[in-house]
């Protein structure tokens, strides 16, 4: 557990790493509660059915055979400057607010390789994670009307939307590695640099997804995000 202020190219992102169902539930409630100056904008968005964009990522360690184990960490980034890292291995139960949040059809969860990552499952003490996800490359390809983007990696997509992104120096089948070696995703406590690595992809996916959706509605396109997502 812990709170961290992470700097991404001059943007300060507040990250919380949590293993308490109560604290996770509070984080979700706080993020969905509009500030007074945002209330009018939120009402307009709901009336127009513009989805809330959330960057999502999952991390898993390797077992003794070298295969990916069940996901140990769930990462969510939203509201410009907030990320949550849920320690699935240690939380007693996944709170109802988080389950409801993940299944909310007004929320568009964007990321890379999400079908595969979700297929790794969660620790057996928890119910499977169910959420409506959109593969970021497919979202960008559809909005930009450029099919070739479907094969683009996160670095290329970030360049398209001018979002700063520097991939980890090393990686693995279960998630990115830190610059000083692989991260133990089952650790109780993480170094600040490790936390930055853990949330980097989810945060960049959020930024790109948000810009994509804003462009979609700015151009008054009638496509619905639901048509390219899944439940």
Predicted regions and their residues:
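Short beta-turn/strand-loop junction motif enriched in small, turn-promoting residues
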Residues: 59-63
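N-terminal accessory regions of nucleic-acid-interacting proteins
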Residues: 1-52, 58, 90, 120, ...
């Amino acid at each position: 557990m812990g709170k961290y202020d992470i700097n991404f190219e001059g943007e300060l992102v507040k990250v919380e790493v949590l293993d308490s169902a109560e604290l996770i539930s509070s984080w979700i409630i706080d993020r969905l509660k509009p500030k007074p100056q945002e209330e009018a904008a939120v009402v307009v968005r709901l009336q127009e059915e513009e989805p809330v964009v959330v960057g999502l990522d999952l991390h898993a360690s390797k077992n003794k055979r070298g295969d990916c184990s069940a996901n140990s960490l769930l990462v969510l980034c939203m509201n410009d400057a907030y990320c949550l890292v849920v320690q699935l291995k240690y939380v007693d139960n996944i709170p109802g607010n988080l389950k409801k949040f993940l299944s909310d059809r007004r929320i568009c969860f964007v990321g890379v390789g999400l079908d595969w990552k979700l297929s790794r499952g969660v620790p057996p003490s928890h119910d499977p994670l169910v959420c409506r996800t959109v593969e970021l490359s497919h979202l960008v390809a559809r909005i930009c009307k450029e099919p070739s983007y479907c094969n683009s990696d996160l670095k290329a997509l970030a360049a398209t939307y001018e979002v700063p992104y520097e991939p980890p120096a090393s990686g693995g089948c279960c998630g990115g590695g830190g610059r000083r070696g692989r991260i133990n995703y089952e650790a109780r406590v993480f170094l600040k640099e490790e936390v930055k690595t853990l949330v980097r992809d989810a945060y960049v996916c959020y930024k790109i997804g948000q810009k994509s959706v804003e462009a979609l509605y700015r151009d008054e396109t009638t496509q619905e995000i639901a048509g390219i997502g899944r439940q």
